[in-house]
Amino acid sequence: MHILLKIVIFAIKITKMDDKAIIKKRIDWFCKNKINAFSPTISPAPKSVERNEIESLYEGLRWFVDRGVNELLVQKKYMGSYCDIYLHKELTDSYLVSRNGYKINHLNRTQWLAALTDLHARFSWSGTAIRIIQSELMPWSALGKGLIANEFSAYYISHQIHADYLQQSDLYAKITQIRQKPEYKAFVADAKTLSSKELKDKYPNHIIRQYQSVRDMKLLDLPNYTKNISLFKKELDIFGKEAPIYFKPFNILKEIKDDGTEVFVNDNLSFQQINDDEFLHYTFADEADFEAKYPEIRAWVDKMNANEEGVVIKPRKAFLPAMPPAFKVRNNDYLTLIYGVDFQDRLQEQINKRNIKGKLKCSINDWAINAKLLQTPYADIHEENYEFKNLVLDRILGEEIENQLDSRL
């Protein structure tokens, strides 16, 4: 089937004309702006009920080892905004691309170019024109300031106001007094044994409404509630603070040479060329070797987790068939920021219902498409390259599936 016809057939599946126009515009924009990659979604590591871990370091490592991927990296997970850096020999020609494939144009160009100076200086540029580098744009507030203020800070303030009111009022004391009264206890006992009609015959309607409200009201453990709010605020202060723009690069995707030839790097160890942060690199001979080495990996992660989001687990080889790019293992303190102040109180419930199957499938598919996008020569990205446009379309359609998943995963 002709590739252009395939694009049309796929587009027919999009029901709204407005959506078709937007998607066509996005695809054309990809080509016009020379976007060579499209970030994948990253799945959390599998849970471990036995270890009481919602995102299990052990299970994430074991998942790869069980599938024959024995050379793995464990790196710090940075809490910012994902971006691809198109780093040019002439630094001022460089540009940034967001997670969804949009050129980032609304940041202060002078500031972010200055923040790339050290990264640029790490390389010899003899014979190389461009390097495409995966990175985290830091801090989170650089792109997420509005989200932080409107959602996370507002959420914290609402809970703090609620806690302050409960501590300062006598509401809980009054409810406790009512619950201790003999007549209330008699009502509760009757409500368990009498039919609805019998209960109405015995008690006036206003008494039934009052006692049912008192019975059904959940009283918070105020010391625990305030502790959870404080934890949420601590995490918000750590990750939501404002600071000058900087980058945490973590993988070189490919290099474009002056003569147009390209090097598809495909090696997560490129991290050490572009980042001085400590990371782990292990090769496991077999299952017993993994079990023997796991405690030292666990100890390193526990030490590193203080005031951080967590870690990512990656194969040494970046692109492997039917494999995700990474698993993320976020710690419980950070997950309080994502799931809310009662996350740790409801941890067992969250573990029981956690299901990463859909997220993992999307991650594997996204990464496979990204490999094909990157294998398209940079010089061949233009509006007449229908094979490339078809890959972009596949990836955009994949977003619709991802949008149906729990956004907190």
PLM segments and residue spans:
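Core catalytic machinery and nucleic-acid-binding channels of phosphodiester-processing enzymes
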Residues: 85, 127-129, 134-146, 150, ...
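Eukaryote-specific, cytoplasm-facing alpha-helical/coiled-coil scaffolding segments in long proteins
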Residues: 158-165, 360-366
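Nucleic-acid 5′ end/cap handling module spanning
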Residues: 54-103, 146, 180, 184-409
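Generic structural signal of hydrophobic/aromatic residues within well-ordered alpha-helices
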Residues: 23-26, 60, 64, 112-122, ...
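Low-complexity, highly charged intrinsically disordered N-terminal segments
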Residues: 10-58, 82
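Conserved loop->alpha-helix
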Residues: 95-141, 172
